[in-house]
Amino acid sequence: RVVRNQTMLAAMHSPGGEAEVALENVRVPAGNLILGEGRGFEIAQGRLGPGRIHHCMRSIGQAQRSLELMARRADTRVAFGKRLADQSSIRQDIAKSWYEIEMARLLTLKAADAMDRVGNRAAKDYIAAIKCVAPQMAQTVTDRAMQVFGGMGLSDDTPVARFFSLNRFLRLADGPDEVHLSQLGKLKVSEYSKSNAAG
C-alpha cells in the first residue's frame, strides 16, 4: 500500500512525487521469481552500474546546457557598464565549467568502456568514481550559472535551478557520495598495497 507521496527538494519528479510504500504479507508465486528466492538484491546490483552511467550522462548534459546558457547570458548581460563576459572571474568560471564537464565526460566514457570490456564488478572503481564526480560537477556548474543569471537563475525562467536540485538528489540516490568515496578509498588502498608489496 502507498503510505504517502512525498516531494524531494520541493519538486515532484514523478506524478505525485516519490511514494513511500509498505509491503505487508506479500507473497510472490515461485513461477514469478527471477533468478530465485533471496536473489533480488543481486539483480538490483547488476542494474546499478548501467543506471549510474545513464544518470551521469544526464548530469553531464545538464551541466553542458547550463554552461551554454551561462555563456550566452554573460555575453548579453551588462552590469555596471560592462558585459559580464568582460569580467575575468566570469570568464574563469566559464572556462572551469568547460574543463570540468570534459573531465567528467571522459571519466564516464572510461567507466562505460570498462563495463563493456571487463564487466560491472571489475569496473566498480570507475562506476563509484563517476557516481560521485558527475553530479558534483553538474551541481557546481549549475551553481555558477545561477550566479551569472542572478535572481532569474533561481526561477523557472531557466532550467538551471532544476538541474541544480536534480543533481543534489543524485548525490544521495543509490547511496550518498561519502559511502562511495569510502568504498573507493578502501579499494584503492588494497589495490596499491598489493602492488607495492609485489614490487
Where are these regions (language model features)?
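Alpha-helical membrane and juxtamembrane elements of multi-pass inner-membrane transport
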Residues: 42, 88-95, 121-124, 128, ...
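FAD-binding core of flavoproteins
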Residues: 1-68, 72, 177-199
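Alpha-helix capping/hinge segments and adjacent helical runs
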Residues: 121, 128-199
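Conserved catalytic-core motifs characterized by acidic clusters
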Residues: 7, 32-48, 73-87, 147-162
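Alpha-helical transition-metal enzyme core signature, strongest for iron centers
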Residues: 60, 64-67, 94-108, 131-142, ...
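Short alpha-helical scaffolding segments that buttress acidic/His motifs in well-ordered protein cores
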Residues: 44, 111, 164-167
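C-terminal helix-coil-helix/basic helical segment that borders enzyme active sites and/or dimer interfaces
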Residues: 71-85, 101-133, 146-153
